[in-house]
């Protein structure tokens, strides 16, 4: 099968030809990237570039074809509406002229699938790090589920906003990478909430640091060390939550050597496999559109021209995945004497649990020391405070702050992830409402951080928690728990409803669930889509 792919979601006009029947992967890519005269991407100028460049790159690729085209695939979204409309129109016209099926591809799923295709991985977690996006995906029940994502700006856009502030031309990522090699680490805000992250505060702090006279190279080093450590930590949390041992990287920011090195080091430390496609498949390109288009066409996932409207807000979890096998069971570490979590090694001894936050080789030493120390102290305090509020938690038996080690009572028989029930989920709703009324959050209440026994449901691992009276923070706690249900449970909708019912009954304020709706709408591409 030969598939012609067309890509043009934002700034890169690209066409590609993929021959699925070739002895070795054969992908011919022709791209023409838009380069603004100054500042960032202007939607109107980008669309004008697409209008001129798309016909040219398609013509070049068609000239390289040595046989008939069997299908046309195009990036249906997400992206800039004016650019997507040009790409969609070109793809429809081409499919009709060639009298072949049309395939509408989700741009972000294509970033994931090109890594899965090239690596041969079966059940990977995917970290997508691109201009407008940053999210972690895993396959579950016929869809790629969003386990975590940016709650404001994309990682690449945050970098570009910083570089525009210092007067550098788009794209900013390569310039930050170059300057960071000569810089010293500068501390910047580190914001991870469960498996979600925020980059707007880091970007603002980086601008302020430059304005205050900190050398630009030092700020660039701080940006890389902070932002990429956040991405790597969340990817590791996703591996731990799902029990998977394969990670693929997608998106243009993935071309950064430091980010790839961090992810590779993290995976090596936990015995997981890692794959990053070659750079031409990481940045926006039609090759990944053609490869996924071939898989979708072979599975019959084509669309009539009349139903092929673009969707500028096309989320990856909206795509029905029909082209791959069902998921295989994840490895169950429950019986292991030593368990490797996302940020700590847990050793079981009699009725005790010894939790050690060992140094993370992928993080800068100063950042790593700060996170390990602060999280150890907070976990001990908040675990005890929650217990005083009446929430079942382990007894804290010993804390060694310099060694970042806590000894706790061993509680429960299983993680909630492996023993889900409406009653236990309702208990989590009551527990979170109680600690929120007490003035603090858990910070990472996933189904791996809840232990269950015959009669009680325990909250554990408060290392990302903190004291706060902000309704927004309480809503984020609820959001993190619900995301973990969606990523691991077959009947997630019913369990989410049970959780929210119990939370609403127990909480002193009714504002948290209202704010939760606002938080859910803040993820990438949640607004009404632009279609045409």
Swiss-Prot record:
InterPro entries to which the protein is assigned, alphabetical: Aminoglycoside_PTrfase, ATPase_NBD, Bud32, Gcp-like_dom, KAE1/TsaD, Kae1_archaea_euk, Kinase-like_dom_sf, Peptidase_M22_CS
Catalyzed chemical reaction(s): L-seryl-[protein] + ATP = O-phospho-L-seryl-[protein] + ADP + H(+); L-threonyl-[protein] + ATP = O-phospho-L-threonyl-[protein] + ADP + H(+); L-threonylcarbamoyladenylate + adenosine(37) in tRNA = N(6)-L-threonylcarbamoyladenosine(37) in tRNA + AMP + H(+)
Residues that coordinate or bind ATP: 338-346, 355
Iron listed as a keyword: yes
Enzyme Commission identifier(s): 2.3.1.234, 2.7.11.1
Region (Kae1): 1-323
Locations listed in the record: Cytoplasm
One Gene Ontology term of the molecular function aspect: iron ion binding
Keywords, ordered alphabetically: Acyltransferase, ATP-binding, Cytoplasm, Iron, Kinase, Metal-binding, Multifunctional enzyme, Nucleotide-binding, Serine/threonine-protein kinase, Transferase, tRNA processing
One Pfam family cited in the UniProt record for this chain: APH
Domain Protein kinase: 329-532
Active site per UniProt: 444
Cofactor stoichiometry and binding remark: Binds 1 Fe(2+) ion per subunit.
The protein's required cofactors: Fe(2+)
Primary role: Required for the formation of a threonylcarbamoyl group on adenosine at position 37 (t(6)A37) in tRNAs that read codons beginning with adenine. Is a component of the KEOPS complex that is probably involved in the transfer of the threonylcarbamoyl moiety of threonylcarbamoyl-AMP (TC-AMP) to the N6 group of A37. The Kae1 domain likely plays a direct catalytic role in this reaction. The Bud32 domain probably displays kinase activity that regulates Kae1 function.
Subunit-structure text: Component of the KEOPS complex that consists of Kae1, Bud32, Cgi121 and Pcc1; the whole complex dimerizes.
Official protein name in the record: Probable bifunctional tRNA threonylcarbamoyladenosine biosynthesis protein
Natural source organism: Halobacterium salinarum (strain ATCC 700922 / JCM 11081 / NRC-1)
